[in-house]
Curated annotation (Swiss-Prot):
Its main location: cytoplasm. Pfam families: NodA. Coiled coil: none annotated. This is Nodulation protein A. Belongs to the NodA family. GO terms for molecular function: acyltransferase activity. Disulfide bonds: none annotated. It is found in: Cytoplasm. HAMAP family: NodA. The lineage of its organism: Bacteria, Pseudomonadati, Pseudomonadota, Alphaproteobacteria, Hyphomicrobiales.
Length: 214
C-alpha cells in the first residue's frame, strides 16, 4: 500500500510553496555525520523550547535525540537549513498482554515559518522506510490537547487511527535517585497501519514501552 498524494490536500498556495521548496533526506542513523547531529540538535532545541526549557534541554551539547535514539530519520531541508524532522525506532511494546513489534515515531518538528508543512507530508516520506523496516504498525504518542489538530491532519485522511483511553508506561531517559525509574502517562495513541490492518491492533488500556520514549 502507498499513500497517494491526494491524501494530503493543499489548503492554499502558501502550503504548496512550502512543500515545493523542501528537499527530503531519508537516512539511517549511522549515515549521520557529527555536523548533521549538531545541526539537528540546534533545530530540535529551538523547536521544543516554546513548550518549556525542560523539553529543549536534551538537545544541548549537539545531542540530536531526547530519549531512545532513533534508527531512521526523515529530514527536510530548504535554503535556510533544516526545515522539518521526524524519526523512527523499531521496538517491542506490550499492549495489554500482547508483545507487539512497532516502529515508534517521534522527534517530530517543523520550523515555525513553515506551518503549511503538515505532519502528513513527513509521513509520506517516512512510509517507505517503515515498509523496509518490516513492521506491522507505526506507533506514536501525543498530548490530548492535539487531538482535534491530528484528527484533521491524519485521522480524516486515513493515515492513522487515534486511540484514547490508554496509559503509557515508560522508563525515564536518565536515572535519578530522587525519582521513580518509570512514569505512567495518559496520552493519545497514534497507530499507523503498515504491514497489518488496524483490526489487528491488540486491545488494552495500558502500553508498556519498557524503555524511554523516542
Amino acid at each position: 500500500m502507498r499513500f497517494p498524494s491526494d491524501l494530503c490536500p493543499s489548503s492554499g498556495t502558501g502550503e504548496l510553496s512550502a512543500r515545493s521548496q523542501v528537499r527530503w533526506r531519508l537516512c539511517w542513523e549511522n549515515e549521520l555525520e557529527l555536523a548533521d547531529h549538531a545541526e539537528l540538535a540546534e533545530f530540535l532545541r529551538k523547536a521544543y523550547n516554546p513548550s518549556g526549557t525542560f523539553n529543549a534541554r536534551p538537545f544541548e551539547g549537539g545531542r540530536s535525540w531526547a530519549g531512545a535514539r532513533p534508527e531512521v530519520r526523515a529530514i527536510g531541508y530548504d535554503s535556510r537549513g533544516v526545515a522539518a524532522h521526524i524519526a523512527a525506532l523499531r521496538r517491542f511494546i506490550k499492549v495489554g498482554a500482547v508483545d507487539l513489534l512497532v516502529a515508534e515515531l517521534g522527534l517530530y518538528a517543523v520550523r515555525p515559518d513553515l506551518e503549511g508543512l503538515r505532519i502528513s507530508h513527513s509521513m509520506l516520506v517516512m512510509y517507505p522506510a517503515l515498509k523496509e523496516l518490516g513492521v506491522p504498525f507505526g506507533f506514536g504518542t501525543v498530548r490530548h490537547a492535539l487531538q482535534k489538530h491530528l484528527t484533521r491532519l491524519l485521522g480524516k485522511a486515513g493515515l492513522a487511527t487515534i486511540v484514547s483511553g490508554v496509559r503509557v508506561r515508560s522508563t525515564l531517559r536518565d536515572m535519578r535517585l530522587d525519582m521513580p525509574p518509570t512514569r505512567v502517562e495518559d496520552l493519545l495513541i497514534l497507530v499507523f497501519p503498515i504491514g497489518r490492518p488496524m483490526s489487528d491492533w491488540p486491545a488494552g488500556t495500558i502500553i508498556d514501552r519498557n524503555g524511554p520514549e523516542l
